[in-house]
From Swiss-Prot:
Entry function: Necessary for protein translocation in the endoplasmic reticulum.
Keyword Ion transport in record: no
Sequence similarity: Belongs to the SecE/SEC61-gamma family.
Oligomeric form and interacting partners: Heterotrimeric complex composed of SEC61-alpha, SEC61-beta and SEC61-gamma.
Regions of this protein lying in the Cytoplasmic compartment: 1-39
Subcellular location: Endoplasmic reticulum membrane
Presence of the UniProt keyword Transmembrane helix in the record: yes
Biological process, per Gene Ontology: post-translational protein targeting to membrane, translocation
Alphabetical list of Pfam families matching this protein: SecE
GO cellular component, one term: Ssh1 translocon complex
Extracellular topological domain residue ranges: 59-70
Protein name, as recorded: Probable protein transport protein Sec61 subunit gamma
Amino acid sequence: MADQIQEILDVPREFLKDGIQFIKKCQKPDRREFIKISQAVGTGFLIMGAVGYLVKLIHIPLNQVLVGGA
């Protein structure tokens, strides 16, 4: 019985230990790296927004033609 409880308690301890080791190895991005990542994310947002706009721009008239304005 005590072995089962010990096994149950070992899982969170190992998880916490691994998490602490991971955080200690991580480092914050420097200013240049942060700007580069921000530009990449911003470009992705713009491209996805443009694609969504174009799809909607084509879909609305096409839907009107197919449905017939019902």
